[in-house]
């Protein structure tokens, strides 16, 4: 039985190379089954112990670009977001840049007074022309298969409820919208709860007509890793 090589992840940790994970990653970006499997087989033949995940995905991107350029661009952007870690702060700063490019005034890691306690939100944004004020909680994951779940949505909703309940006359920073942002995806339960309870979501593939990828492309704001 062939032993799979050990590769070096972006955060410096080691793991066994899994061709199936590469196939899934390519498919999530829109690659057809045959193309994803063919690329994974080609790369598997070249990977040796000590190869970095960055080298693997750069090779995958080069091969995917030959198959379909739009899919390759989507794949490259998603990988770049995954490599912003290991902490969530670079992702918070990136999303702040995206909102600024869309015309918002943004403050990161701001403390907002609630009815019961004060809350530090990952970013606070105001749009004077639209007279809108929002606060956002960001969840960064460096695993493309990890989804932000119902538990997170419930937690975020409770924080926003406390902020909304604060009397406007004493509120240190008024908001009228609460947002949960992730660089990956949401579980179906998290989406159902958010749509019912009024929590706005923004993720790689949600909402369908205004995804994080779409907004990055329109604003021409891209992560640098």
Q: Positions of the model-derived regions?
A:
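Acidic-basic catalytic patches of nuclease active cores, encompassing PD-(D/E)XK
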Residues: 77-113
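Compact, charge-rich alpha-helical regulatory domains located at protein termini
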Residues: 216-225
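Short, charged, surface-exposed secondary-structure boundary motifs
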Residues: 146-147, 209-217
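Short, mixed charged/polar active-site loops
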Residues: 14, 118, 131-133
